[in-house]
Amino acid sequence: MTSTLARATSASLRSQNVTPPTRTRVAADAPRPRTHLPTHLRPADLLRITDQGVADVLDGRHDALLPAEWDTTHRWSTRLYADDDLDVWLISWTPGEATELHDHAGSLGALTVLSGSLREYHWTGDDLAVRVLDAGDQAAFPLGWVHDVVKNPTIQVAGPTLSVHAYSPPLTAMSYYEVADAGHLRRTRTVLTDEPE
């Protein structure tokens, strides 16, 4: 069905002997154009995926992957999903165990807090900023994002503190940092890994 505006525009162009440009149809299965990102997934996609991961855990779809008893002294993680484009993890958080200041190399990331509360320290370019992420909160990590995540010590919950994380492309490396004098970061090491911090 053609709109009145489209018909009027076509008639106007024909009267001026202007040929409208030919539209090219792209097949639905045609590859997406390449972007500057290392993945076709965007941060918004990863946030949606982590939100779905939380729903799946709460619905019991991953019960077979969960420990029989929650370890309250050591962090653990379990992979919920993996393919060439995406890794999805369930991560536990215990008191006093920080991840260290790190990046995700060439991967984008996102998380949704399933239970409890996290405190994230992220590098702003000249200082560390802090944000608190409570159950249901989400955060995305663009390329170059440097942060340290820890269980929020000011919030006590009866069960474990858990979050679902997605990385695209899947993690292959992480660099670790320290804040140096004069307000800049110094890389301390880079490790090859296929597991989250």
What does each of the following model-derived ranges do?
Residues 95, 106-121:
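Glycine- and acidic-residue-biased ligand/ion/polar-headgroup-sensing regions
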Residues 66-95:
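A short glycine-rich, His/Asp/Glu-containing loop-to-beta-strand
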Residues 1-61:
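N-terminal leader/capping segments at the start of a protein or of a new domain
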Residues 166-197:
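Conserved double-stranded beta-helix
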Residues 110, 122-151, 188-192:
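Short acidic-glycine-tyrosine-enriched beta hairpin
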Residues 110-112, 156-174:
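A short hydrophobic beta-strand segment most commonly corresponding to one strand
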Residues 89-104, 133, 142-144:
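Conserved short histidine dyad/triad with adjacent acidic residue
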Residues 145-152, 164, 173-178:
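Intrinsically disordered, low-complexity, charge-dense segments enriched in Lys/Arg
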